[in-house]
Amino acid sequence: YDDLDTICKNIHDKLVSGIEKRLVADAKVGYLLSGGLDSSLVCAIAARQSDKPIRTFAIGMSEDAIDLKYAKQVADYIKSEHTEVIITKDDVLSSLDSVIELLGTFDITTIRASMGMYLLCKYIHEKTDIKVLLTGEISDELFGYKYTDFAPSAEEFQKESQKRVRELHMYDVLRADRCISVNSLEARVPFGDLDFVEYV
């Protein structure tokens, strides 16, 4: 096995490579920025690779939403061209039937997790010339997030992580792909880079 320093360097290098591969596009590229670590990493690395400000997008139900605050801090730091989309309860309720039909489920957690992405992508499709979106999807499943907070051992953590990666296509990837593609946008997921996933 590699030592910790080597592992960290390899994860860094493979993520940077995965992002660089996904920046090649004939169409305009945008970035979903939630303010969380995963999307912030993707945006920061992409901003470093770009010779002009990248275009980032965040969504929230009020201007003082905590996610919008963190996304704005990241956007300011990386000097992106940042757009905040504020949605209302009526926006959510009027889109509920469409999102349920799109996802093919009544699962509350899945619908809740999808609504913001669906409405943000709808905004991007209707109001911008962006055709390709980079996201921070899949990092939670690869690195544990809340799923493994209480794993009794390193072996159990690894077992749960491997299970989540094997079943990835049934959950978040499908949800994100549907919310993005229904709005005529192409999703690109650097954390899903095969070389990166296999190493992690």
Regions found by a protein language model. Give the residues of each.
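ATP-dependent adenylate-handling active sites, centered on carboxylate activation for C-N bond formation
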Residues: 1-200
